[in-house]
Regions:
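N-terminal export/membrane-targeting signals
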Residues: 1-23
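Aromatic-Pro/Gly-enriched surface loop or interdomain linker
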Residues: 22-27, 32-131
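Extracytoplasmic/secreted envelope proteins and their assembly/folding machinery
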Residues: 65, 100-104, 151-155, 177, ...
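Short, surface-exposed beta-strand/loop micro-motifs that present aromatic residues
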Residues: 70-73, 227-231, 266-268, 272-285
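Short alpha-beta junction capping motif
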Residues: 82-85, 129-175
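Short, solvent-exposed loop/turn elements at domain surfaces
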Residues: 89-95, 144, 249-253
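An acidic, glycine-rich "communication" segment
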Residues: 167-257
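Short, surface-exposed loop/helix-turn segments at secondary-structure junctions
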Residues: 252-271
């Protein structure tokens, strides 16, 4: 929240002799005091964010735990082990801490998987990844892997039949690694459907097990919805889309009529299009 500084200038009137009063009135008005600029807010460091997430309030934790299903949709054949990676090189979503707590709680309650958490690039190496069945990118942004060995470690991980999952901003990564962007399915290209707005969603694959929670019905939800660069979006030929924006609802489709989004209309062209929010794909032998 921006701080506003209000400066009040008080003018004092003095009684002057009659012969000087007229002359005084002709004097140029005094200059107003310059407004003092608010002090710039200190930019949070990565350690500041981590400290904030470590102090997630009990009320916030309770609300997350209340929303988590009591059991898995399907019974797992075995307990899996996942590595949750949450580093950011770009915009930092404040919800990362809540996401980490949610995943830890699901792992503990449902016992379908166990979860380890890291923000250290060095942990993305072949030897370490052998311990895991999946990598979850929790709202990571602008990830730039440090070397070819890390990139190859993820490719080998996928070739071994393992899995990668991405939450929200996972689509805002790998701008210097085309194969990584293809693995995710696309790259961020703005969010005309902004945070705080309530948007309609439809089930593109209502019978899929991951959509059972919606009981075959579309829904409205408050969230920030990404769209993806046409040149990087893998499209419906490569992606099995589970949920997308319901463009039949005027509240959703009319957003693109805003003059601010003319560049997007030029990019995507006229007519209906699919804006996915959840999908699956096979990639290099993994999923």
């Amino acid at each position: 929240m921006k701080k506003t500084i209000l400066l009040l200038t008080l003018a004092a009137a003095f009684l002057a002799p009659a012969d000087t009063f007229a002359a005084d009135q002709k004097k140029a008005p005094a200059k107003k005091a310059a407004k003092k600029k608010p002090a710039p807010r200190k930019k949070k460091t990565w350690d500041d964010w981590k400290a904030e997430w470590a102090m997630l309030s009990d009320a916030k934790k309770a609300s997350i735990e209340k929303a988590v299903p009591k059991k898995s949709t399907v019974k797992p054949q075995q307990v899996r082990r996942v590595l949750v990676f949450f580093r950011c090189g770009g915009f930092v979503h404040a919800s990362i801490g809540a996401g980490n707590h949610m995943l830890a709680h699901v792992a503990k309650q449902n016992q379908a998987f166990s979860a380890d958490f890291t923000d250290v690039y060095a942990d993305l190496n072949s030897e370490n990844l052998k311990k895991y069945d999946a990598i979850i990118f929790n709202n990571t942004t602008h990830l730039v892997l440090e070397n070819d060995r890390q990139r190859q470690a993820i490719v080998d991980f996928m070739k071994a039949g393992k899995g990668v999952a991405g939450i929200h901003a996972a689509g805002d990564n790998f701008y210097k690694w085309k194969l990584g962007a293809a693995m995710i399915g696309g790259q961020f290209n703005g969010h005309p459907w902004t945070a705080g707005g309530k948007w309609a969603f439809k089930l593109d694959d209502p019978k899929h097990v991951l959509n059972r929670a919606f009981h075959g019905k579309g829904f409205w939800h408050t969230d920030e919805i990404y769209q993806y660069k046409p040149e990087t979006y893998e499209g419906e030929k490569n992606l099995r889309i589970l949920v997308s924006l319901d463009m039949s609802k005027e509240a959703v489709s009319k957003i693109m009529d805003n003059p601010r989004f003319e560049k997007y209309r030029q990019q995507y062209g006229p007519g209906p299009r699919t804006v996915p929010v959840s999908w699956l794909r096979e990639f290099e032998g993994g999923r």
